[in-house]
Amino acid sequence: MTTSDSAVHTQPFQAEVSELLHLMVHSVYSETDIFLRELVSNASDACDKLRYEAIESPALLGEGDALKIRIIPNKTAGTLTIADNGIGMERQELIDHLGTIARSGTKAFVSKLKEAKDGLGLIGQFGVGFYSAFMVADKIIVVSRRAGESDVWSWTSSGGSGFEIARASEEDAARVTRGTEIVLHLKDDAKKYLETYEIERIVGAYSDNILFPIELVPEEGEPRQINSASALWQRSKSELSAEDYKKAYQQIASAFDDPAMTLHYRAEGRYSYAVLLFAPSTKPFDLFEPSRKGRVRLYVRRVFITDDADLLPGYLRFIRGVVDSEDLPLNISREMLQNNPQLVQIRKAVATRVVSELEGLAEKDAENFAKIWDAFGAVLKEGIYEDFERREKLLALSRFTTTTGEKRSLKQVVADFKPNQTEIYYLVGDSIERLKSNPRLEAATARGIEVLLLSDPVDAFWTSMPTEFEGKPLKSLSQGDLNLDLIPRVDATDEAKKDEPEADEAATIAVIKAALGERVSDVKASTRLTSSASCLVADSQGPSRELERILSQQNRGMRAKPVLEINLRHPMVGAITKAQAGSKAVDDLSLLLLEQAQILDGELPEDPAAFAARLNRLVLQGLGG
């Protein structure tokens, strides 16, 4: 033991932790009960970790008490203690786990927490529930001894800018033989949490299904267990109520919302395993964090192994719950999990069952399915791109905003096909509102064709592959040639409007090509425009313009030159034919056709200053200036 180890060290919190603590110390949240749920959950995790490590090193458990959690109120001292005899922490682990938040997205999380009405739910989702204790305590002392170690450490903070860490006193060291003890010095307005009935109420509401016994140690009387400590997923569905499932979901997911879908079953056969999975009804703030993985916990015969086993594909990462295997070896390493043949089969079977359950929910309970789709539809669509085996099912599950203004399934869209329509049409962009006014819709709108309006970033990816639904190809209105001539227009009088073009096709295209030079790959007469002058489209063989835009923003490829389509019936295009080839007016009008198409596509002209000067020049000419 060195002198420096013996001394009391004061260390600052990580900046984001200080900000988080400030929110907790000055909390305006009313649901302060969460602190006990979070501390009990952390204690349970510590017991899980010890049980897992003891598979390889049985001596860590020793001959002592069974793994458990104790809650000890002390009205005389005004303290509430939550203690476990789990894995415990060394000095550096106390610093790392309680002084920093070692994961990406921390700044975004703290910012979101400031804005969120359900901030407490975010705390549990992000895995920083320990800090919620500062809502009710003005001082916290943590005493911990790691399993198999002799040193005992004490961590103390009042929720300010830092914390103290030192060797524990002899008295504390004698009391904490293994695990962690958290002593909360409660604020005056939080003394209700010293009442045994309050503690029992909170444990019953949030922690009843914790797998380890939770003992309440009153100041008078004998300790007693206050939770059922049963693996709810191992029980029969007939024994469980909707309220049981709700409590289990909220405990497993550290959530406050109700589950929108519950899947509970037992698989028997070649492999035996129990499954209890939930789909939340609200979206977690970090759903699209690159580091976010699935949150399904793997157990083997009720022993927690890991929550990092990738039990479901990435597009189902919003699902929470438990898979408990009867056949996997208890001592399976986390490294072996990825390629274990049993687990490969379990992953495949569980993913198929989840998708099947979503299909059933979509048919039988449209309201709850809508909650799932609104929160997680963008994630589910990743599966259309990633999971060829289930692509057709995921397409059937998908709900798309269309030009009808409603969210519709592809089955509904196909059922309402117009005469002679053979393809499902779509447009990809960055917002529904901008897509609604996109000029590429004009020919389809004139025929009453329903078009999918796709505005999630993932839409640019899954639509980049040849895709069809029930034999009907999906066709982009912004890529390749378009021929809608066989589909009659809604208003027959519209047919008369396309009789005489304002411009001679070959001559006009040649003039515009000459004016634009290398800015575009080609100039074509448009079959998709009825009232706008021009639009940009991508070649049928390459990536869409939307995918190009996303990839270029990530520095992942050059953008191809677009095809400029012109409306030969538009007066502006007709004016180009009438003007003298090579004149300034022809150059200005041709460039303006390109630049306004870029603007309508959500892009800036290549040279905004030149565009403004050109526009001013043409306006003044029109005014006779």
From Swiss-Prot:
Database matches in InterPro entries: HATPase_C_sf (IPR036890), HSP90_C (IPR037196), Hsp90_fam (IPR001404), Hsp90_N (IPR020575), Ribosomal_Su5_D2-typ_SF (IPR020568)
Taxonomic lineage: Bacteria, Pseudomonadati, Pseudomonadota, Alphaproteobacteria, Hyphomicrobiales
Region (C) residue spans: 550-625
Similarity comment: Belongs to the heat shock protein 90 family.
Name of the protein in its database record: Chaperone protein HtpG
Keywords: ATP-binding, Chaperone, Cytoplasm, Nucleotide-binding, Stress response
One GO molecular-function entry: unfolded protein binding
Residue ranges of the region described as B: 335-549
